[in-house]
Amino acid sequence: MTNIRKTHPLAKIINNSFIDLPAPSNISAWWNFGSLLGICLILQILTGLFLAMHYTSDTTTAFSSVTHICRDVNYGWIIRYMHANGASMFFICLFLHVGRGLYYGSYMFPETWNIGIILLFAVMATAFMGYVLPWGQMSFWGATVITNLLSAIPYIGTSLVEWIWGGFSVDKATLTRFFAFHFILPFIISALAAVHLLFLHETGSNNPSGIPSDSDKIPFHPYYTIKDILGALLLILALMMLVLFSPDLLGDPDNYTPANPLNTPPHIKPEWYFLFAYAILRSIPNKLGGVLALVLSILVLAIIPLLHTSKQRGMMFRPLSQCLFWLLVADLLTLTWIGGQPVEHPFITIGQLASILYFAILLIFMPAISIIENNLLKW
């Protein structure tokens, strides 16, 4: 009798995705982040569900309902902080996952890569709306500033912003709809992640060498299941260290002050994982230009496959490209730092230089260096 896991319609899908899946024998720990992102998503949905049971999406009670969760609900404080810091872990895994894709040429699977970019936008939108829900000072002013950016769109901008707000300012209608969207988006993300996996399994995983590995495959279980479990344990360890020892390390103290439309905080800034994009936005003195640069800072990833000029897939054997990649990482860290600084000298200039360098590396230097490397190897 054939094993039920290979014949049952539902079990067969799980089997072909997580058990009998042929995987390259040499994929490193950088390939762990896909499964870690899945764990983050499940964790966020579960903690979010329990928070939604006690949260009220009304401007008068939202802040006090979050306080109530932390003070009065059984283990509410740990659920709340796991959800808030879980978002940070989610983005750490996301950035490492995208970085891995850039380094090893995983963008050569165009469908998987493009769905990944859509996923990145969806997760960013979800995180932004989630940050608005506690209705603290930074929630309110963050929502006001970021939604206001849409008014830069010619002709329809102002109407679009008022339509999103549900009024003439960020108010009750805005909070209610943000809660609704924040609740539904993770399920859309789950569906997109399934499609992301579907396309990945059409081609099979890439590997560090960038060489096709069809001749040397091993089953996913037990080799990579055990490896993923180790990664998951380390992720949960890091998350719980953050939650239990310094839960407010990555948050903003301003968000412990209830939202006040009459009092603007001195420095409006988003959560740390948006600071790089925020720095790029602020580096352009024109409103529409800034918004375009903000969108392009992520959308630029979509044209990376078209700019691949190297004869090799990954950067494993390309030291010049490796130097450029790590320069890009340093540049993103610089942008993250600048995004959290006030708009004054010398931060403005540093931000502008770092923004130019970010686009220059991706659009000019990387393709150019790849051509030079091809010539050095006489290919």
Swiss-Prot record:
Q: Name one GO molecular function term.
A: metal ion binding
Q: Which residues bind a ubiquinone?
A: H201
Note the InterPro entries from the entry: Cyt_b/b6_C, Cyt_b/b6_C_sf, Cyt_b/b6_N, Cytb/b6-like_sf, Cytochrome_b, Cytochrome_b_C_euk/bac, Cytochrome_b_N_euk/bac, Di-haem_cyt_TM
Protein origin, superkingdom: Eukaryota
What PROSITE patterns is this protein classified in?
Answer: CYTB_CTER, CYTB_NTER
Can you tell me which family this protein belongs to?
Belongs to the cytochrome b family.
This chain belongs to the protein called: Cytochrome b
What is the source species? Martes foina
